[in-house]
């Protein structure tokens, strides 16, 4: 199966969820409404692209004429995992943290993404990372000053700009309403979970 754009991956996930929840695929109008398209025709164009990439089959003459291909059904749990609520003390990529998978090519990011994290809050809004965005993350354990990281501080996961001075780490927000998080490595726990390598907003690249 050819790599999908984030918007195509979002539509494919919507189709999968609708089939799982209701037993049938969504109509073009339903896709347009849920994803904010101006018309069902816009949804139709994306469906044609998914068909060309071998993800779905379109059956003409019916509003719900969408069928997942066998290849897509076999790879439901592949692609980039979207990480939801992270339990204290558990690895961030533990299976129980995965909400769903997006069929997005990891190599479209540089370095390649290992997982997606849904952004909560507006502490990084000044650099275009907004609440509800999907942050593409490259898994690493160390960071350089100035990099935007996903960090775990005493089991709280946060996205901030990294700065280390001696034995103290400052996690800086990109929003003047938030003060830096100071982490004294002498007695506090800090784990770097990865580097931010891209953002998906409403299914579009930024």
Swiss-Prot record:
DNA-binding region(s) in UniProt: 28-48
EC number: 3.4.21.88
Signal sequence region: none
Keywords: Autocatalytic cleavage, DNA damage, DNA repair, DNA replication, DNA-binding, Hydrolase, Repressor, SOS response, Transcription, Transcription regulation
Entry's Gene Ontology BP terms: DNA repair; DNA replication; negative regulation of DNA-templated transcription; proteolysis; SOS response
Cleavage (site feature) positions: 88-89
CDD domains referenced in this protein's UniProt entry, alphabetically: S24_LexA-like
InterPro entries in UniProt: LexA (IPR006200), LexA-like (IPR039418), LexA/Signal_pep-like_sf (IPR036286), LexA_DNA-bd_dom (IPR006199), LexA_repressor (IPR050077), Peptidase_S24_LexA (IPR006197), Peptidase_S24_S26A/B/C (IPR015927), WH-like_DNA-bd_sf (IPR036388)
UniProt-annotated catalytic positions: 123, 160
Entry keyword annotation includes Membrane: no
GO molecular function list: DNA binding; serine-type endopeptidase activity
Subunit relationships: Homodimer.
Protein's job: Represses a number of genes involved in the response to DNA damage (SOS response), including recA and lexA. In the presence of single-stranded DNA, RecA interacts with LexA causing an autocatalytic cleavage which disrupts the DNA-binding part of LexA, leading to derepression of the SOS regulon and eventually DNA repair.
HAMAP family: LexA
Family stated for the protein in its record: Belongs to the peptidase S24 family.
Protein name from the UniProt record: LexA repressor
């Amino acid at each position: 199966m050819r790599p999908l754009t984030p918007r195509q991956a979002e539509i494919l996930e919507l189709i999968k969820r609708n089939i799982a929840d209701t037993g049938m695929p969504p109509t073009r109008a339903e896709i347009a409404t849920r994803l904010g398209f101006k018309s069902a025709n816009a949804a139709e164009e994306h469906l044609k692209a998914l068909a060309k990439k071998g993800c779905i089959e379109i059956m003409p003459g019916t509003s719900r004429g969408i069928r997942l291909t066998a290849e897509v059904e076999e790879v439901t749990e592949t692609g980039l995992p979207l990480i939801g609520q992270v339990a204290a003390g558990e690895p961030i990529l533990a299976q129980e943290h995965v909400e769903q998978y997006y069929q997005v090519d990891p190599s479209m990011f540089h370095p390649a993404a290992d997982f997606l994290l849904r952004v909560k809050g507006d502490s990084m809004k000044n650099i275009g990372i907004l609440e509800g965005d999907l942050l593409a993350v490259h898994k690493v354990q160390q960071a350089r000053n100035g990099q935007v990281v996903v960090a775990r501080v005493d089991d709280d996961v946060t996205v901030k700009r990294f700065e280390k001075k001696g034995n103290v780490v400052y996690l800086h927000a990109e929003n003047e309403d938030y003060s830096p998080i100071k982490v004294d490595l002498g007695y506090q726990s800090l784990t770097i979970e990865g580097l931010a390598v891209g953002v998906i907003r409403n299914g579009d690249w930024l």
